């Protein structure tokens, strides 16, 4: 148990300091900045123009689909980057497990493309 704590103590200290610092900055900004909401601050901003319509209008479902697809393939990169850093040190099982992961994601991407999820009509 002591060996594990020794190895991860730097990460734990970094996490604690960053959490404390971000909390202090957030609380200071909340208490020190005057809170005076007016009509201009609470209205929707449309690139300098007056809003044409209500800002609470519904979005097209394609925006959500694009956001979900972005998250999926962004997470793929978060798994792929550490794997590429330790590629020379891992065994053949680690290599082929990532290849299987990439093949599954590629098949999913081809399926989405075939079904027209990426088309904007």
UniProtKB/Swiss-Prot annotation:
Subcellular location: Mitochondrion membrane
Pfam families xref list: Oxidored_q4
Membrane topology: Multi-pass membrane protein
EC number assigned by the record: 7.1.1.2
Catalytic activity: a ubiquinone + NADH + 5 H(+)(in) = a ubiquinol + NAD(+) + 4 H(+)(out)
Any one GO molecular-function label of the UniProt entry: NADH dehydrogenase (ubiquinone) activity
Top-level EC class as recorded in UniProt: translocase
Membrane spanning residue stretches: 11-31, 63-83, 90-110
Domain of life: Eukaryota
GO CC aspect terms: mitochondrial membrane; NADH dehydrogenase complex
Keywords assigned: Electron transport, Membrane, Mitochondrion, NAD, Respiratory chain, Translocase, Transmembrane, Transmembrane helix, Transport, Ubiquinone
Described purpose of this protein according to its UniProt entry: Core subunit of the mitochondrial membrane respiratory chain NADH dehydrogenase (Complex I) that is believed to belong to the minimal assembly required for catalysis. Complex I functions in the transfer of electrons from NADH to the respiratory chain. The immediate electron acceptor for the enzyme is believed to be ubiquinone.
PANTHER family: NADH-UBIQUINONE OXIDOREDUCTASE CHAIN 3 (PTHR11058:SF9)
Family: Belongs to the complex I subunit 3 family.
Protein name: NADH-ubiquinone oxidoreductase chain 3
Organism: Chondrus crispus (Carrageen Irish moss)
Classification lineage: Eukaryota, Rhodophyta, Florideophyceae, Rhodymeniophycidae, Gigartinales
